[in-house]
Structure formats: C-alpha cells, structure tokens
A protein has these predicted regions:
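Enzyme catalytic cores with a strong preference for nitrogen-chemistry domains
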Residues: 1-168
Length: 168
C-alpha cells in the first residue's frame, strides 16, 4: 500500500477494547487509511449470532453454570456506509448476515450510498463438512440475484468466489 497505490483490502477482524467493548468487524484498507489510520473504514456486524457473539437476555445463568468464558460483541448499525473503492461502493457483511435480505436492503435507503458490490467474509471452519458450507454459498448467490449486484465472498473454508449480478 504505497501512497499512490490502487490497492484495497477488506479484512475480517475483532476490533475494540475491554472498556468500550468488542465488535466483529471488517476493516477497509487503502493508501489513504495507511496515511491516516484513524480514518480506516470499519463495518461492525449488525446481526449477531446468539451464544456465539452475544448472550441472549435471561441466559447468563447458563454461561455461569457452564463456566465458559463467553462475552458479548457490540452490535453495529443496520444501515452502515459502504467502503469506497474508486467509483464503486462495497457493502461488507459478515457470515450469515447475508441470510437477512431485509437487513441488507436497508443499505439501499440512500441512493448516493447504495452499494454497487456486496462482500461477504466468513469463518466457516466450525461447520466442518456439513451442509451449511454449501447452503451459505447458495444464500450468497440468491442475494446477488435479488439485489442484481455482484458479491465478493471470502471464507477460510467453503467457497471463496466472485458471484455475478445474476447469481452465477
């Protein structure tokens, strides 16, 4: 990422600290953010997974009984701004957030900020060789078809693919 670089990257990473709280996030990197790291693009996951990313109300007793070190991630906003890449607006989502089309649709509320590309980052290793790996790819394909937008999908297991606006 030199100062004149035309390279961009989205990286899935937990961000935050003990005092403020942690978020399951996507960080957007570019030459501009290298020069001013405080201006780094950040998407914080909105639709958190029960027990994996937050403890549902009324179930703290279960975590205490199991003596498991589980904590809560902080939820991000529903209508997060996109990551600007040249003349494109990339809308990240994390893991199974692409299952919730009505939540993704909220990102189209402002036509000036509406995504032109969707990007999904997922840690699917905990599924093993289960059907969920293939199901998640099919969900991403349907979202591309639904919104008529391409999707960039990066996973540590499963399918890392580029899906066109027709879901192919």
């Amino acid at each position: 990422f030199g100062k004149d670089s035309q390279r961009y990257a989205l990286i899935g990473v937990p961000l935050g600290d003990f005092d403020v709280g942690y978020t399951n996030s996507v960080a957007g990197l570019s030459a501009e953010t290298q020069a001013a790291p405080e201006g780094m693009y950040r998407y914080n996951k909105h639709h958190l997974v029960p027990f994996g990313e937050f403890i549902p109300p009324g179930f703290r007793w279960f975590v205490q009984m199991m003596n498991m070190p589980l904590g809560d991630f902080t939820r991000g906003p529903l209508n997060a701004p996109p990551f600007a890449v040249r003349d494109q607006r990339v809308a990240p989502n994390i893991c199974y957030e692409d299952l919730y089309g009505e939540e993704l649709a909220a990102r189209f509320a402002d036509p000036r900020q509406a995504p032109t590309i969707m990007a999904n980052v997922s840690n699917l290793a905990w599924f093993g060789e289960q059907v969920a790996i293939h199901q998640h790819l099919q969900i991403a394909r349907m979202r591309s078809l639904e919104f008529q937008l391409p999707t960039l999908r990066a996973t540590n297991t499963g399918a890392t693919v580029v899906i066109d606006h027709e879901g192919l």
